[in-house]
């Protein structure tokens, strides 16, 4: 929607100032993991919810950017969904990770390995 708005604004400016050369080039540099989800790779997300259920963790699903590596890899066909770390105040000088959250995140990782190994 934002890209369309920008292009529409450029077109409006071109009509308003026909002698001006106005060029707009939009290049995607950061993909959305959600755009990469399909029926073929959805299983890895299902594993996350199964692991959380088996560990008694209540999911709180939110849309978020997961970092450039994961976003790029996902757009290349290898889905890399995020699951919790339990951290707080990300990318600030007050960022912290409670020990209990670290423990749960570690249990989650081990449970995912177990589920994936079972198939």
Residue map of PLM features:
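Metal-dependent amide/peptide-bond hydrolase catalytic core
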Residues: 1-119
